[in-house]
Every structure is written in structure tokens, then in C-alpha cells.
């Protein structure tokens, strides 16, 4: 993946770090040794903090729900301060109704490592993501058509569908549930929040986070700054679908669509929308490369090309 993206532009080293405002104070995220000492007003070392948090952890079935996993992981005080309110706003649901897998994506560290990700390679395109995508599409065998409706009876050798899987089948089993985002962009002088992202954990604050974009490129200098405030809500028919909900009802619908997809030929479903899964960027690129290899091999030797390279139900 790293070698692939570097073919299309210069990547600048960048470490994504997030701060959080909770109960009127600013903390380090994801929850780490600094967060714990900040929150409890202590100066514990790693081993002491690990034992301290373990003593506060509740005995819960960690697989039952987001809430159960969170309380079993960090105890009620840290859970209610940093996880409960933010999650209610982001998903519009009680955390007791959400799967534990959502929280398992975030680390708990007993060190002062406040990186949001611990991947080996962490960077951002020096010229922005638009330039990277433009370079990917700049190929003599690629034709880009905008505002073009797909008709399934058109004579394509094979379709790679990255749109919503339910939309491909005309929503015949109903619309899959998504959360969408509303953005409020503002222009300011100077520097507003001093960091790239500030999460707002309290449930009574309507927005989930504020992004100050110039901090994504610390090698640049700007007198002005743009902030974007995010508000999460249920996605409607005309909204951009961001986060698949994947609760019991949605999983039942998804099974119907997956069965439908596997019964047709000439199309492969990929990506967040095509497989109705929450995917990070590196995973998305890896799955796209894998799908391309499978499709190319199938077209070359005439073997059946699967509807999915990765099982959406796994």
C-alpha cells in the first residue's frame, strides 16, 4: 500500500494527534497515561496506572456491546467522560445498542504515546489528496465520465461497484442505515484551537468535533485559518452516507443484498459503500488492489469473478 500511494505524489511525514474537550477541560486522546493522570490529577507511572484502571474496570461481557466493552476496559469515570457522550452524538444511539467492535478500533495506552494510529507508515500527501487521485486517473486507458448514470444492461466486460450496495439493487430490500455529517465551515484570523482536531465529548455540546485544516500541513504558513465543525445525524435519501450502522436490522438487510449480489454476474462490490463496512484508508486501498488483481486474472483466463473479494458479513 505504501509503495502504491507513493507512485502518485510526494508523501510528507505526518502524525495524526487528537485532543478532547470534556467537562470544560482539554485532554489527550486516545486515552493514554497522560489522559489518565490529567483526569484524575495524579502522577502515576505505567504499571501503577494499569493497576489503577484495572481496579476501576467493571465485570462485563466485553463482546456484548460498546458500553459493556468500554466499562470493562476503563471503568465508569473515564467511560462517561470520554466515550459515552461522544458516541451518542456520533451514532444517535445508546452505546448499549452498539457493537463492541466500534470501540475496539481505538487503543488504550499506558504510556505517553498520543498518536491516534500506530501504523509503521504515517504521512499525508504534500499536495493534498485531490492531486493524488488526479494522478491515479491520469492514464491513457482510464476514461472519466461525470454525471453519468449506470445502466446494468450496458455492455461492460465487468463492473466494479463502489457505490452503496442497496442502491445498485434499487433499494429492493430497503435502505441500509447510515450516519451522515453536516459541516459548518468558518474563516478566521490566525490560529483558533492550536491543534488539527478537537473532539467534544460532552453530550450537551451539539457537535462532535472541530477540525482546523492548516494543522494538517505544519510545513506551510498561513495568516488565515479554516475550521470545520461536524454535526452527526441519520442519513436520509439525499445525504452522503458516511458511517454504516450495522446493527441487527441492518445486518439482516445486508444478508439479503449479499445473497442478491452473489446471484448475479459481471459485477464486483468493493469499498465502504459496496461492502457496507467501516474501513480505514489503508485497508480500503489494500482491498482495492486485491480486487483489481482478482478481476484482472478472471478477465484474462475466463474464470468466474466473485461478487466480493472480502466477505461483507464476516
Regions found by a protein language model. Give the residues of each.
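C-terminal lid/capping helical subdomain adjacent to the catalytic/cofactor pocket in oxidative enzymes
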Residues: 174-187, 196, 253-314
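Active-site/ligand-binding neighborhood in enzyme catalytic cores
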Residues: 20-158, 162-167
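General small-molecule cofactor/ligand-binding pocket signal
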Residues: 12, 143-147, 268
Amino acid at each position: 500500500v505504501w509503495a502504491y500511494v507513493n507512485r502518485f505524489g510526494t508523501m510528507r511525514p505526518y502524525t495524526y494527534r487528537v485532543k478532547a474537550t470534556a467537562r470544560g477541560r482539554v485532554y489527550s486522546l486516545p486515552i493514554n497515561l497522560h489522559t489518565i493522570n490529567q483526569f484524575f490529577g495524579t502522577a502515576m507511572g505505567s504499571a501503577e496506572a494499569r493497576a489503577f484502571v484495572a481496579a476501576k474496570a467493571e465485570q462485563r461481557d466485553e463482546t456484548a456491546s460498546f458500553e459493556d466493552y468500554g466499562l470493562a476496559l476503563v471503568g465508569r469515570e473515564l467511560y462517561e467522560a470520554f466515550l459515552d457522550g461522544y458516541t451518542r452524538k456520533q451514532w444517535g444511539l445508546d452505546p448499549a445498542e452498539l457493537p463492541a467492535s466500534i470501540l475496539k478500533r481505538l487503543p488504550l495506552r499506558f504510556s505517553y504515546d498520543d498518536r491516534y494510529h500506530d501504523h509503521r507508515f504515517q504521512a499525508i500527501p504534500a499536495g493534498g489528496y485531490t492531486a493524488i487521485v488526479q494522478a491515479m486517473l491520469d492514464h491513457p486507458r482510464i476514461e472519466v465520465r461525470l454525471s453519468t448514470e449506470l445502466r446494468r444492461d450496458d455492455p461492460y466486460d465487468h463492473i466494479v461497484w463502489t457505490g452503496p450496495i442497496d442502491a445498485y439493487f434499487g433499494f429492493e430490500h430497503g435502505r441500509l442505515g447510515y450516519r451522515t455529517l453536516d459541516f459548518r465551515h468558518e474563516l478566521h484570523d490566525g490560529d483558533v484551537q492550536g491543534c488539527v482536531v478537537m473532539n467534544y465529548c460532552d453530550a450537551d455540546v451539539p457537535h462532535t468535533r472541530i477540525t482546523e485544516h492548516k494543522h494538517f500541513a505544519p510545513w506551510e504558513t498561513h495568516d488565515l485559518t479554516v475550521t470545520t465543525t461536524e454535526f452527526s445525524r441519520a442519513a436520509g435519501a439525499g445525504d452522503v452516507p458516511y458511517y454504516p450502522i450495522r446493527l441487527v436490522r441492518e445486518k439482516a438487510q445486508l444478508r439479503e443484498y449479499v445473497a442478491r449480489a452473489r446471484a448475479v454476474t459481471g459485477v464486483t462490490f468493493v469499498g465502504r459503500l459496496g461492502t457496507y463496512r467501516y474501513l480505514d484508508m489503508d485497508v480500503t486501498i489494500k482491498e482495492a488492489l486485491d480486487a483489481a488483481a482478482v478481476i484482472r486474472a478472471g478477465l484474462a483466463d475466463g474464470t468466474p469473478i466473485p461478487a466480493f473479494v472480502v466477505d461483507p458479513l464476516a
